[in-house]
A protein has these predicted regions:
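N-terminal beta-strand/alpha-helix entry module and adjacent surface
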Residues: 1-106, 111-195, 202
């Protein structure tokens, strides 16, 4: 993304999801979206991730590039917010280790189903832990494999009609996934490509 001109600054290998509209364009890197879709295990109800990346203003349009994600510990039964100060502190430590050059873009939830109404907790979490410019929110429901991308603006959560998935080498995200896998396996048995393939397997 270093050539001159708009097209030279955008990823070349992309896949469009839905219809793209408006002056804010969202690009989710493939390793990140795969991680969000496959992180939940059969015995879990929900996982929460903080999204990292960077933004570029190109020809009066704001482009969001999300190429990092760090899991945040949460309490499913927490009444006020989904995460707390302690989990946020741990996320910052992990992000400093694996994504030192990226900034917070927003967050994501992967959960089993949508029967539990979390709207109040989601909005409260957004207000308490994220700045107005950290407004991206992604949700994936594993039971029916549906997903949606939102922007929090003016106190509301607005669903986007479309976004892009892009494909690039992403060593930082691969290294983070390796760190998760090696909790269950010996480090010498795992490398970045192997871990990435495991997350991509359906």
């Amino acid at each position: 993304m270093a050539e001159q001109g708009k097209e030279g600054m955008l990823p070349k290998n992309i896949r469009q999801i839905g219809q793209i509209s408006g002056n804010q364009k969202i690009y989710l890197e493939d390793y990140v979206i795969t991680y969000l879709r496959q992180i939940l295990t059969p015995d879990e109800n929900m996982r929460v991730m903080i999204l990292y990346g960077h933004k570029e203003m190109i020809e009066d349009e704001l482009y969001w590039f999300v190429n990092g994600a760090v899991e945040a510990q949460h309490d499913f039964f927490m009444e006020k917010t989904i995460i707390d100060e302690e989990s946020w502190k741990k996320v910052n430590e992990m992000a400093g280790k694996f994504f030192p050059e990226l900034t917070v873009m927003g967050w994501a939830i992967t959960r089993e189903d949508s029967t539990e109404d979390l709207e109040e907790q989601i909005m409260r979490t957004q207000r308490q832990f994220f700045r107005p410019d950290q407004k991206l929110y992604f949700e994936y429901i594993t039971s029916d494999k549906t997903e949606a991308l939102y922007l929090h603006e003016k106190g509301k959560r607005n669903m986007l009609s479309g976004y892009y998935i892009y494909y690039e080498r992403n060593e930082c995200m691969q290294n983070y996934m390796v760190s998760l896998r090696t909790r269950e396996r010996h480090p010498e048995e795992m490398n970045a490509d192997h871990a990435a393939r495991q997350f991509r397997e359906v």
